[in-house]
Amino acid sequence: MSNQELLQLAVNAVDDKKAEQVVALNMKGISLIADFFLICHGNSEKQVQAIAHELKKVAQEQGIEIKRLEGYEQARWVLIDLGDVVVHVFHKDERAYYNLEKLWGDAPTVELEGVIS
């Protein structure tokens, strides 16, 4: 599976659980961590967990290794490392505080298909 296909798989999974303000950043040449960051938020702890759980389920169904999953229990900022794609699922109250889009402001955004934010 290509990095772009992995990104789209993640986008579809978070969108399925109604993640809001879904943004993908192209990190190629900017970060050694991943090629893409996918950033979104949920409006409650339960929704944040549902988004993370759905992504984990979909990844496992596709045989994609989850290298790391952090923050699930607190559901304020869940990080799901899929290798070339790192997904950040924030609680809406935390997203503005951490403002990853501004922190990584030199990273271009990626056009996403099928997402209504």
From Swiss-Prot:
<dbReference type="GO" id="GO:0042256">
    <property type="term" value="P:cytosolic ribosome assembly"/>
</dbReference>
<dbReference type="GO" id="GO:0090071">
    <property type="term" value="P:negative regulation of ribosome biogenesis"/>
</dbReference>
<dbReference type="InterPro" id="IPR043519">
    <property type="entry name" value="NT_sf"/>
</dbReference>
<dbReference type="GO" id="GO:0043023">
    <property type="term" value="F:ribosomal large subunit binding"/>
</dbReference>
<dbReference type="InterPro" id="IPR004394">
    <property type="entry name" value="Iojap/RsfS/C7orf30"/>
</dbReference>
<comment type="similarity">
    <text>Belongs to the Iojap/RsfS family.</text>
</comment>
<protein>
    <recommendedName>
        <fullName>Ribosomal silencing factor RsfS</fullName>
    </recommendedName>
</protein>
<keyword id="KW-0963">Cytoplasm</keyword>
<dbReference type="GO" id="GO:0017148">
    <property type="term" value="P:negative regulation of translation"/>
</dbReference>
<comment type="subunit">
    <text>Interacts with ribosomal protein uL14 (rplN).</text>
</comment>
<keyword id="KW-0810">Translation regulation</keyword>
<dbReference type="GO" id="GO:0005737">
    <property type="term" value="C:cytoplasm"/>
</dbReference>
<dbReference type="Pfam" id="PF02410">
    <property type="entry name" value="RsfS"/>
</dbReference>
<keyword id="KW-0678">Repressor</keyword>
<comment type="function">
    <text>Functions as a ribosomal silencing factor. Interacts with ribosomal protein uL14 (rplN), blocking formation of intersubunit bridge B8. Prevents association of the 30S and 50S ribosomal subunits and the formation of functional ribosomes, thus repressing translation.</text>
</comment>
